[in-house]
């Protein structure tokens, strides 16, 4: 998967289409990502010692990686990603602008 933790992405499909956020976690086995502030769900939390009150909390649910696109840092537009070899290392680059994402 080409999307990594810390990438700024835009949702391109689903109920949160158009929203932007930062990837907080990548679930490689399921090909999903968790984006801050996107795909919020309500979880019914049982009371425990750490949370004595319990109740309903809002958390981010995973979203499929195909439903997000990386925001190109050079022009702030969504772009597809590619991989090329520079100085013997694989680096990601933006297909739209051709600029390297990983420094």
Swiss-Prot record:
Keyword match Ribosomal protein: yes
GO CC annotations, alphabetized: ribonucleoprotein complex; ribosome
GO biological process, one term: translation
Annotated GO MF terms: rRNA binding; structural constituent of ribosome
Alphabetical keyword list: Ribonucleoprotein, Ribosomal protein, RNA-binding, rRNA-binding
UniProt cross-references to Gene3D superfamilies, sorted A to Z: 2.30.30.30
InterPro entries registered for this protein in UniProt: KOW, Rib_uL2_dom2, Ribosomal_uL24, Ribosomal_uL24_CS, Ribosomal_uL24_KOW, Translation_prot_SH3-like_sf
Any single Pfam family the record assigns to this protein: KOW
Coiled-coil boundaries: none
Quaternary structure annotation from Swiss-Prot or TrEMBL: Part of the 50S ribosomal subunit.
Family affiliation: Belongs to the universal ribosomal protein uL24 family.
Its job: One of two assembly initiator proteins, it binds directly to the 5'-end of the 23S rRNA, where it nucleates assembly of the 50S subunit.
Name of protein: Large ribosomal subunit protein uL24
Species this protein is from: Levilactobacillus brevis (strain ATCC 367 / BCRC 12310 / CIP 105137 / JCM 1170 / LMG 11437 / NCIMB 947 / NCTC 947)
């Amino acid at each position: 998967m080409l999307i990594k933790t810390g990438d700024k992405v835009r949702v391109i499909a689903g109920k949160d289409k158009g929203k932007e956020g930062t990837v907080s976690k990548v679930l490689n086995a399921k090909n999903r990502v968790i984006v801050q502030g996107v795909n919020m769900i309500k979880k019914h939390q049982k009371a425990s010692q750490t949370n004595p009150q319990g109740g309903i909390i809002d958390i981010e649910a995973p979203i499929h990686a195909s439903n997000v696109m990386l925001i190109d840092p050079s022009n702030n537009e969504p772009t597809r990603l590619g991989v090329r070899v520079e100085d013997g290392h694989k680096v990601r680059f933006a297909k739209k602008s051709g600029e390297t994402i990983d420094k």
